[in-house]
Amino acid sequence: MTSTLNTLKSNSGSRKKKLRKGRGIAAGQGASCGFGMRGQKSRSGRPTRPGFEGGQMPLYRRVPKLKHFEIINQKNFSIINLEKLNDFKDNDTVNIDSLVKKGLIFKPKFPLKILGNGKINVKLKVQAHSFTKVAKQKIEDAGGSCELINNK
């Protein structure tokens, strides 16, 4: 027999009927509907919220909030955008010391990273610990050079 669209049927047992609870004991889920006799879990409005421990102070409230938790191996940088480097003259060398003298960096606590925001109009020799791809491209397009410093 060939099957056509009007004769298609689903396999037996593949479509289960919905359990109708509370519709008599013959259905198997009558009276207490499978929730047992008494107690909080048999009442209406159930279930309790996630993390509820029966009135005891829950774990997520017992444990202190860890504020100012330091990320392990996090790399911090002193960052400078390219537009700030326009304060220098042509063929100047830009490094942490020259940036401190100009007042662009206050405390040379972290390694220097050059970001590519803005345009650069001067030819500079930039010495930094890290460059973004865009920053390196823009410095070299302006006729300058980028030199990576090793920080140990």
Swiss-Prot record:
Alphabetical keyword list: Ribonucleoprotein, Ribosomal protein, RNA-binding, rRNA-binding
Keyword rRNA-binding on entry: yes
The keyword RNA-binding is assigned to this record: yes
Disulphide-bonded residues: none
Pfam families: Ribosomal_L27A
Composition skew (Gly residues), residue ranges: 25-37
Ranges annotated as biased composition (Basic residues): 14-23
Single Gene Ontology BP annotation: translation
Start and end residues of each stretch annotated as Disordered: 1-57
Coiled-coil blocks: none
Any one GO cellular component localisation term in the record: cytosolic large ribosomal subunit
One MF annotation (Gene Ontology) recorded for this entry: rRNA binding
UniProt record similarity statement: Belongs to the universal ribosomal protein uL15 family.
Subunit structure: Part of the 50S ribosomal subunit.
Function: Binds to the 23S rRNA.
Descriptive protein name: Large ribosomal subunit protein uL15
